[in-house]
């Protein structure tokens, strides 16, 4: 009897330890500097991606994120899968990260991801002079128009999110997509982050994609960071503790989405 009980307890322990593991799942991350901090292989603890992997346990996790990236395109944005930039520029956009991913899948470099996570929006809010049309259109207005044919025709945040997600869903129809709003930022300002996040959330709802709201539910609070750096090193980018907090939160949130 004791032996049977011991075996049962062992099985329960094994099952518990496997909870939240996704050994067969390939994951891809798109985004800006806070995702880029974790490195392309998600092996740097300064980025939330390392902590996400340690909690979510995917088979693979590859980041296509770039520092300075925005959702919002410009009239000069063109498809570019070879250029590299760590600052805000016409082609440093989620649109081109998606096409780099698509090219990697087509050439066999990247397995078809089971999950694609897009966390961006800070730079759209922060560098409004570089993306002057970003907040000039609501999600309702963007979706009332014909889908833009190319990036240079999608120069608002809402139209850029719509176009990018349409490409992702068309090119990777079997992949789950999760959108994440930017965390709060001292430099970007509360109003701008809130406006950007609301548009991303509205677009996600329109498309039918789940959205995780870091701006409201994340551990980084701009007022707190302004007084004392707790989860960031500069008020905008995570330190190791902030990366841990956000990465583990995102892993749990995605698990909760999967369970529904």
Region locations from a protein language model:
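Oxyanion-hole/transition-state-stabilizing segment in secreted/luminal serine hydrolases
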Residues: 81-152
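Serine-esterase "nucleophile elbow" of acetyl-processing enzymes
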Residues: 16-80, 116, 225
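Extracytoplasmic/secreted proteins, especially bacterial periplasmic and envelope-associated proteins
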Residues: 29, 47, 51, 100, ...
């Amino acid at each position: 009897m004791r032996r049977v009980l011991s075996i049962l307890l062992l099985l329960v322990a094994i099952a518990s330890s496997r909870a939240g593991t996704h050994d067969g799942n390939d994951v891809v991350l798109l985004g800006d500097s806070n995702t880029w901090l974790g490195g392309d292989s998600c092996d740097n603890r300064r980025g939330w991606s390392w902590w996400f992997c340690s909690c979510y346990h995917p088979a693979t996790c590859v980041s296509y994120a770039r520092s300075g990236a925005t959702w919002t395109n410009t009239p000069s944005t063109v498809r570019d899968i070879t250029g590299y930039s760590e600052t805000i520029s016409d082609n440093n956009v989620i649109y081109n990260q998606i096409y780099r991913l698509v090219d990697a899948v087509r050439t066999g470099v990247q397995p078809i991801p089971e999950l694609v996570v897009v966390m961006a929006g800070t730079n759209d809010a922060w560098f409004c002079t570089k993306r002057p049309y970003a907040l000039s259109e609501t999600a309702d207005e963007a979706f009332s128009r014909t889908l833009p044919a190319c990036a240079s025709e999608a120069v608002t945040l809402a139209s850029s999110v719509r176009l990018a997600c349409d490409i992702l869903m068309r090119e990777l129809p079997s992949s789950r997509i999760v959108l994440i709003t930017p965390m709060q930022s001292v430099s970007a300002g509360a109003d701008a982050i809130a406006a950007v996040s609301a548009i991303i959330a509205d677009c996600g709802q329109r498309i039918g994609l789940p959205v995780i709201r870091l701006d409201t539910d994340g551990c980084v609070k701009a007022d707190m960071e302004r007084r004392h750096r707790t989860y960031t090193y500069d008020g905008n980018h995570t330190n190791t503790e902030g990366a841990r907090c956000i990465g583990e939160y995102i892993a749990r949130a995605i698990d909760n989405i999967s369970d529904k």
